[in-house]
Amino acid sequence: MKHLAIYPGSFDPLTNGHLDILQRSLGLFDKVIIAIAVNSNKSTLFSIEERLEFIHKVTQGLKGLEIDTFQGLTVDYCNKVGANSIIRGLRAVTDFDYEYAISLMNKKLAPNVETVFLMSSGEYSFISSTIVKEVARHGRDVSNQVPEIVGKALLKKLSQ
């Protein structure tokens, strides 16, 4: 049996922490789909097209990876594509409470889908897309927190 997992998120922007979780999950599953959530009620800095482009460029050459977008509930997307696992990265204990509650609801909605929690590597445990955007808005360097293409796009977008 093939083990297919999805790694869902808004990835606005993609960070080195996201890449850490992704690369480690590729060692655990036969295939991983990075599933970019499209939420018309949520305001994003980067368009879905920009986020797709960043992820495609940064992950070129990674085996066992697919990139897609989805709307609606994550578990519905899992069932649509035949995924049996959802990957979630945890930076700190505070992430766990939120993610655990969501995983319990997901289990009620889709008993066939498991949530797999991966702890962030220490050097990425403080990185979040929200923090990266805030630091970049104040003109500070975020080049160690995001891939180069994302860092350049952040500077350009925030200087407009």
Swiss-Prot record:
The keyword Metal-binding does not apply. The record marks 18 as: Transition state stabilizer. Its main location: cytoplasm. Its EC number is 2.7.7.3. Substrate binds at residues 10, 42, 74, 88. Pathway: Cofactor biosynthesis; coenzyme A biosynthesis; CoA from (R)-pantothenate: step 4/5. Reversibly transfers an adenylyl group from ATP to 4'-phosphopantetheine, yielding dephospho-CoA (dPCoA) and pyrophosphate. Homohexamer. PANTHER family: PHOSPHOPANTETHEINE ADENYLYLTRANSFERASE. Belongs to the bacterial CoaD family. This is Phosphopantetheine adenylyltransferase. It comes from Leptospira borgpetersenii serovar Hardjo-bovis (strain JB197).
